[in-house]
Amino acid sequence: MNSQQQKQPCTPPPQPQQQQVKQPCQPPPQEPCIPKTKEPCHPKVPEPCHPKVPEPCQPKVPEPCQPKVPEPCPSTVTPAPAQQKTKQK
């Protein structure tokens, strides 16, 4: 009877110990995975975003907007007040 009792409590303890050793081994592989996703994400986002957005946006907006608004605006506003001032004097 003594020999059987000793074998029973001896077999269950080693099982839970092995499981605990595997748990701490899983977190280490996750660490090197975090920097790998950030590296290819940073250079890939600003590269295609910066040159593709400002290039077609800057020349298309100021070109047709600036010459069409200031040209007819100052030519009709400047001569009107200039003539009135000279007539009053």
From Swiss-Prot:
Keywords tagged on the record: Cytoplasm, Keratinization, Repeat
Gene Ontology biological process terms, A to Z: epidermis development; keratinization; keratinocyte differentiation; peptide cross-linking
Chaperone listed as a keyword: no
Induction: During squamous differentiation of epidermal keratinocytes.
Task performed by this protein: Cross-linked envelope protein of keratinocytes. It is a keratinocyte protein that first appears in the cell cytosol, but ultimately becomes cross-linked to membrane proteins by transglutaminase. All that results in the formation of an insoluble envelope beneath the plasma membrane.
Segments of this protein annotated with the region Disordered: 1-29, 68-89
Intervals holding Sequence repeats: 3-14, 18-29, 31-38, 39-46, 47-54, 55-62, 63-70, 71-78
Compartment(s) of residence: Cytoplasm
One Pfam family of this chain: Cornifin
Ranges where the record places region 2 X 12 AA approximate repeats: 3-29
Bias (Polar residues): 75-89
Top-rank taxon: Eukaryota
Region annotation (6 X 8 AA approximate tandem repeats) ranges: 31-78
GO CC annotation terms, alphabetical: cornified envelope; cytosol
Designated name of the protein: Cornifin-A
Protein's gene: SPRR1A
Molecular-function GO terms, alphabetical: structural constituent of skin epidermis; structural molecule activity
Main location: cytoplasm
Similarity annotation: Belongs to the cornifin (SPRR) family.
